[in-house]
From Swiss-Prot:
<dbReference type="InterPro" id="IPR040442">
    <property type="entry name" value="Pyrv_kinase-like_dom_sf"/>
</dbReference>
<dbReference type="InterPro" id="IPR003700">
    <property type="entry name" value="Pantoate_hydroxy_MeTrfase"/>
</dbReference>
<comment type="subunit">
    <text>Homodecamer; pentamer of dimers.</text>
</comment>
<keyword id="KW-0566">Pantothenate biosynthesis</keyword>
<feature type="binding site">
    <location>
        <position position="45"/>
    </location>
    <ligand>
        <name>Mg(2+)</name>
    </ligand>
</feature>
<comment type="function">
    <text>Catalyzes the reversible reaction in which hydroxymethyl group from 5,10-methylenetetrahydrofolate is transferred onto alpha-ketoisovalerate to form ketopantoate.</text>
</comment>
<comment type="pathway">
    <text>Cofactor biosynthesis; (R)-pantothenate biosynthesis; (R)-pantoate from 3-methyl-2-oxobutanoate: step 1/2.</text>
</comment>
<feature type="binding site">
    <location>
        <position position="114"/>
    </location>
    <ligand>
        <name>Mg(2+)</name>
    </ligand>
</feature>
<feature type="binding site">
    <location>
        <position position="112"/>
    </location>
    <ligand>
        <name>3-methyl-2-oxobutanoate</name>
    </ligand>
</feature>
<feature type="binding site">
    <location>
        <position position="84"/>
    </location>
    <ligand>
        <name>3-methyl-2-oxobutanoate</name>
    </ligand>
</feature>
<dbReference type="Pfam" id="PF02548">
    <property type="entry name" value="Pantoate_transf"/>
</dbReference>
<keyword id="KW-0479">Metal-binding</keyword>
<dbReference type="GO" id="GO:0005737">
    <property type="term" value="C:cytoplasm"/>
</dbReference>
<keyword id="KW-0963">Cytoplasm</keyword>
<feature type="binding site">
    <location>
        <position position="84"/>
    </location>
    <ligand>
        <name>Mg(2+)</name>
    </ligand>
</feature>
<keyword id="KW-0460">Magnesium</keyword>
<feature type="active site" description="Proton acceptor">
    <location>
        <position position="181"/>
    </location>
</feature>
């Protein structure tokens, strides 16, 4: 696979070519995903739960993300890598710049931050320094206490309008990509069509430019109850490779997510 760039992802949006993304945290899985043709990998702070065994993403530190980014880059040299800035690692511009440098040096193409209007100044400073930025709105796990738990966001009209306004403001301020998590399908469609940057959905219906899943959910190895928007692709396949290929196919052909995976 040739190196994936932000320009290529933007062209896919223009040409309405959907793409599949996935989380990964180590060399072996990132190499497998890359060999299957996954173009985008997120080194997510979800590792706090899937790798470290915590009950939330909040304990994850910047050093954890840097370590796992290095491992993933070795396994996926040509894949577009997005790395999370974890909780309280970007509380002001100085801290954001310092920690972004750590992550980019570790091999990421892009950093991701959760939040809306309060991030504008930080986004502008990073963008002025030519750093690629992915925004993340809707259900933002780093703020699940404030949100009252892991709930669908944007169901009410005023909440939906707020998310639309935030998405437009984030793009205007300099983000290069946006993740929408757990919002109604119609709202995600409207936001996706309103932005010129690629929009990736998780639990937000099929009308975004791309889809992302946590690898453990996709492979059916998450213990306990999983979110309703996830799908166990391994249960329908006889190998991990075939499960990933099925995931890619279903995303590219708008089969997944179906209505039962959407809100």
């Amino acid at each position: 696979m040739e190196s994936i760039t932000i320009s290529q992802l933007k062209n896919w949006k223009i040409n309405k070519k959907k793409f599949a993304a996935i989380t990964a945290y180590d060399f072996s899985f990132s190499r497998l995903f890359s060999n299957c043709g996954i173009p985008v990998i997120l080194i997510g702070d979800s590792l706090g739960m899937t790798i470290q065994g915590h009950t939330s993403t909040l304990p994850v530190k910047i050093e954890d993300i840097a370590y796992h980014t290095k491992a993933v880059r070795k396994g996926a040299p040509n894949t577009f890598l997005i790395s999370d800035l974890p909780f309280m690692s970007y509380y002001d511009t100085k801290q954001a710049l310092k920690n972004t440098a750590k992550i980019i040096r570790s091999g990421a193409n892009m950093i991701k931050m959760e939040g809306g209007k309060w991030l504008i100044e930080i986004i502008r400073e990073l963008s002025n320094r030519l750093i690629l930025i992915c925004g993340h709105i809707g259900l933002i796990p780093q703020s699940f206490h404030y949100l009252g738990g892991y709930k669908v966001q944007g169901r009410k009209e005023n909440d939906a309008n707020k998310l639309i306004d935030e998405a437009l403001l984030l793009e205007e301020s300099g983000i290069n990509m946006l993740i929408l998590e757990c919002i109604p399908e119609k709202l995600a469609k409207k936001i996706t069509e309103s932005l010129s940057i690629p929009v990736i959905g998780i639990g937000s219906g099929k009308n975004t430019d791309g889809q992302i899943l946590v690898m453990h959910d996709l492979l059916g190895i998450t213990e306990g109850k999983t979110p309703s928007f996830t799908k166990n692709f391994l249960s329908e396949s006889d190998s991990i490779q075939k499960a990933i290929q099925k995931y890619i196919y279903e995303v590219e052909h708008s089969i997944y997510p179906s209505k039962k995976h959407s809100f």
